[in-house]
Structures are given as structure tokens and as C-alpha cells.
């Protein structure tokens, strides 16, 4: 029973997230030989002010959107 977690900044549309979930689920089914019903996808979204790379907050590097 695979559990796949995506961590990303907020701002993607519901349609983008649905497309991601569909594609990653299909990939898990094909490569791991599991039933679709066994695949769980969790999307954790973060405010850009709570995420940093290279020592810089993403809200500064990329803006608040």
C-alpha cells in the first residue's frame, strides 16, 4: 500500500493537483504492480514564507503568490 507525499508551496489549482494525483497514481500502479485502490497521495502545502532554499525564504525569492 504505497503512500506518496508531495510537499510544495501553495498556489496550484485544484485541477493541477487532480492531474498530478491521477498521473502519480497511474505510475504507482504500473511500476509497483499494485491496485489503484491501494495508492494514497497526500499533498502538503506550505506558505512561501515558511519554506526556504539557499538561505532565502521563498516569499522573498519568488514573491508571495
Regions found by a protein language model. Give the residues of each.
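A domain-level signal for the structural core that forms small-molecule/cofactor-binding pockets
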Residues: 2-65
Amino acid at each position: 500500500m504505497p503512500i506518496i507525499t508531495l510537499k510544495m508551496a501553495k498556489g496550484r489549482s485544484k485541477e493541477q493537483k487532480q492531474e498530478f494525483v491521477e498521473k502519480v497514481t497511474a505510475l504507482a500502479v504500473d511500476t509497483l504492480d499494485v491496485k489503484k485502490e491501494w495508492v494514497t497521495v497526500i499533498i502538503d502545502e506550505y506558505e512561501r514564507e515558511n519554506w526556504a532554499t539557499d538561505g532565502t525564504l521563498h516569499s522573498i525569492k519568488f514573491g508571495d503568490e
